Amino acid sequence: MTSGATRYRLSCSLRGHELDVRGLVCCAYPPGAFVSVSRDRTTRLWAPDSPNRSFTEMHCMSGHSNFVSCVCIIPSSDIYPHGLIATGGNDHNICIFSLDSPMPLYILKGHKNTVCSLSSGKFGTLLSGSWDTTAKVWLNDKCMMTLQGHTAAVWAVKILPEQGLMLTGSADKTVKLWKAGRCERTFSGHEDCVRGLAILSETEFLSCANDASIRRWQITGECLEVYYGHTNYIYSISVFPNCRDFVTTAEDRSLRIWKHGECAQTIRLPAQSIWCCCVLDNGDIVVGASDGIIRVFTESEDRTASAEEIKAFEKELSHATIDSKTGDLGDINAEQLPGREHLNEPGTREGQTRLIRDGEKVEAYQWSVSEGRWIKIGDVVGSSGANQQTSGKVLYEGKEFDYVFSIDVNEGGPSYKLPYNTSDDPWLTAYNFLQKNDLNPMFLDQVAKFIIDNTKGQMLGLGNPSFSDPFTGGGRYVPGSSGSSNTLPTADPFTGAGRYVPGSASMGTTMAGVDPFTGNSAYRSAASKTMNIYFPKKEAVTFDQANPTQILGKLKELNGTAPEEKKLTEDDLILLEKILSLICNSSSEKPTVQQLQILWKAINCPEDIVFPALDILRLSIKHPSVNENFCNEKEGAQFSSHLINLLNPKGKPANQLLALRTFCNCFVGQAGQKLMMSQRESLMSHAIELKSGSNKNIHIALATLALNYSVCFHKDHNIEGKAQCLSLISTILEVVQDLEATFRLLVALGTLISDDSNAVQLAKSLGVDSQIKKYSSVSEPAKVSECCRFILNLL
């Protein structure tokens, strides 16, 4: 940083919290205000006090029974024009406050451990992360869905509202991208716990971690850049209003300001853990630390603290202690450090650290370019006579080293970090250092000798230590801080001349008027353009088409190829023929117990030959007595489990298709509907695995399954169920191309959100409106665009 550049200086110090300040967030009202949360169990609202260049505590809120860990602002609404404050705590709860209420308006319960991160989206959506390894999506006072996939605490969450995307960062070292409740992508690269996330744009975000690194990512998965500078855990990251530059805070007692991809300024604080930060609209930086004090830093001369306040801050900083094990000072041997006279030499760059010996003490100083002086940043503890065994490892670029030397190559130029472990070869380390930094190889011997000289005591038979820089020869050495899925053919593999067709893609029950599921062209009447006859759908859509002769013919043909111990007997085949005839002829006669037992036996045939039996089941399950027999509380779990196993993506497409159609037909009976609702999590999660294929009939069956679930959820107003179904619909819409499947998904969506403002808000927050807009211009079939426009009117 050049002397002409503006730099941040203290604006004010705010005292009020009694313990660590763990979270900060800017708020729109009052203008320029922010909210803080603390281990003292309180939440405080601070508003600017312009005449005094400070802030006034406007409001103190309580509601948690344990430490408060995180905070975010829920944007304004008609009911709450100034927005709401959401806080998460160690009591596993999320408290929601208005800006003028000392107690919560309501409390969100559901997490099983500390809530450590919060982020808000559009329409009142809230995303929370917890030590229980999950993230949860909330709408108003209800949990809409739970995001499961991380294997350790979810330390960071962010919402990208424009695309309906969500990000979670975890102690499992990964970041995950979620769409409509499903994990779309996992970002790997960090070598330790991910602690913070920040959004740069609709396509890029930042992450920081315990590995002391910051990474810039594209949402498509690429890591664009890695930034190093901190020497210990990075706890928080916040972006400037320009959405390019950012600030970070860490366990190394520092706030670091990053501009144009480089660390432009380092500000030391008189506290060990700098837990949190936020950037105000005017560019000022607010920082919370383990000493319970909130500090504001500014570039503005008008908002800079008085000379007395800055002097008091520097005095407080000078009295701080720096643990050589956890600071960024590398290996320290007090006996070999220069004395106070070393401070007469000016530094070469902003934030440069220098250690000096003052009697028995070791003091750390930081160079200020703008002031042209060394500022004391603390006394180093654990350094007198220290060697590397007692002073610990140094963290650099996410790895631990015995030493990390800072080397200035040219006067006033950048410094380079040279990491080294005592088990390394000095010459190989020197060679790698020169190669990495594109430096002249003629310095190889000098660098290697520098390493050897400055690691005395760790290598036998080596010379005395020296603090000379191998490039300048001066006293420049500063001990420094450092799946594919199965692709199915587009055409149904079971169709063709004279071949048995297991069901049809476009069969459904009727609605009032002409059924849009039949594809009847009369559906394009003028009335349909003004009246919504598409949704809400009131009854389940089923797959009814049957050709008993072909089904039985294929059953007998495949049975003849089965192993003897797996074959159906002639009597078995006769019983199956009777039940099929009974079903197809709409007989008032009920299937016998024996017939139902044989049907169960038939659907348990080997997977290579079972699909004709599944087709009989698909037709039979609509019969009340068959539905009750297979779907009752006693038998239902085993029945559904068997069919779910057939949905294996590596299984036979015919079995997948007919199992899905059977599930769709189960909804016509009371027992079947109850079973489908009780098994929805397992069924939906397995069914969605089939979305990646290109078999249009499977896509239509998936869409129909979603539609039938939406019919049930519309009846009982189950908001969590609606959230699951919205996730299913959104996920299928991402890949489906067949317009009949698309139409059924649109009807399902319309049914879910009809007469339910919460469901409308959730759909909007998931970005479903932007997902379906393209269908509003479909010309054929017209039912697709007409249905889409009705939905967009609701959204």
Curated annotation (Swiss-Prot):
Residues 533-794 form the PUL domain. WD repeats lie at residues 17-56, 63-107, 110-148, 149-188, 190-227, 229-268, 270-307. Plays a role in protein ubiquitination, sorting and degradation through its association with VCP. Involved in ubiquitin-mediated membrane proteins trafficking to late endosomes in an ESCRT-dependent manner, and hence plays a role in synaptic vesicle recycling. May play a role in macroautophagy, regulating for instance the clearance of damaged lysosomes. Plays a role in cerebellar Purkinje cell development. Interacts with ubiquitin. Interacts with UBXN6, VCP and YOD1; may form a complex involved in macroautophagy. It is found in: Nucleus; Cytoplasm; Synapse. The modification N6-acetyllysine is found at K529. GO terms for molecular function: phospholipase A2 activator activity; ubiquitin binding. Induction: Up-regulated by tumor necrosis factor alpha (TNF-alpha) (at protein level). It comes from Homo sapiens. This is Phospholipase A-2-activating protein. Keywords: Acetylation, Cytoplasm, Developmental protein, Disease variant, Intellectual disability, Neurogenesis, Nucleus, Phosphoprotein, Repeat, Synapse, WD repeat.
